[in-house]
Regions:
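Small-residue-rich midsections of specific transmembrane alpha-helices
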Residues: 1-22, 76-84, 137, 174-177
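Interfacial/gating helices of multi-pass transporter permease domains
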Residues: 1-7, 63-67, 123-128, 162-166, ...
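Alpha-helical transmembrane segments of multi-pass integral membrane proteins
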Residues: 2-7, 38, 71-75, 86, ...
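Membrane-water interface segments that mark the loop-to-transmembrane alpha-helix transition
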Residues: 4-54, 63, 67-73
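C-terminal transmembrane helix end/exit motif
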Residues: 15-18, 84-91, 95, 115-119, ...
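Alpha-helical transmembrane segments of multi-pass membrane transporters/permeases
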Residues: 26-29, 35, 74, 88-114, ...
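Alpha-helical transmembrane segments of multi-pass membrane transporters
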Residues: 41-49, 102-122, 136-141
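Interhelical loop/hinge segments that connect adjacent transmembrane helices in multipass membrane
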Residues: 96, 100, 123-125, 140-177
């Protein structure tokens, strides 16, 4: 449903392309910027879907369910951003960092989800804390680990657009799959 469609737009099928870019045609900052663009597009489309559906009366979701969809989408966007940094780690020969990222993120989000839902029985609060826990892992672990392997630079929008164009067939495949 909504939480499955929009993350595929955000990921754009780019992970495999990025880790196989052995000649470095596109720099890490270009990949990062492209993911920010695709995540922003996915969020805008999801918000639009929820809002338009609600305004036209075609929304199959209650207000609480709509909030849950958006919170879970936020969680998936953190996952999508993490993928770009995981690919940077992998290209630098540090697949161990990728494994640790998944292990820590999985344990922290599972614990936050389970404990919060058990203690509060409030799904909205549970998803909000799960999103927060995922953000903490991203900013405290994933991002600092990857920053050791690239020099941040200001990518040119034309390079980002070229990357997105080159990956468009992967994005279509990812979306349809």
């Amino acid at each position: 449903t909504a939480t499955g469609i929009f993350p595929s737009i955000a990921s754009y099928g780019m992970y495999s392309f990025q880790v196989s870019d052995i000649r470095g045609k596109y720099g890490a900052s270009t990949y990062i910027r492209s993911r920010v663009w695709t995540c922003a597009l996915a969020v805008a489309l999801c918000i639009g879907f929820v809002a338009v559906s609600a305004l036209t009366g075609e929304n199959p979701y209650s207000a609480q369910q709509s909030v849950c969809v958006l919170l879970f989408l936020g969680y998936r966007m953190v996952e999508s951003l993490t993928d770009i940094y995981n690919a940077i780690d992998q290209r630098s020969g540090r697949l161990d960092i990728v494994g640790k990222t998944y292990a820590v993120r999985g344990a922290v989000t599972l614990a936050s989800f389970t404990l919060t839902l058990w203690l509060t029985q409030d799904i909205v609060l549970t998803l909000a804390l799960m999103l927060g826990a995922s953000l903490v892992v991203f900013f405290v672990y994933s991002l600092p680990q990857a920053r050791a392997f690239y020099a941040p630079e200001q990518p040119q929008n034309a390079r980002v657009a070229a990357l997105l164009w080159e990956c468009l067939p992967l994005a279509v495949y990812s979306f349809l799959n």
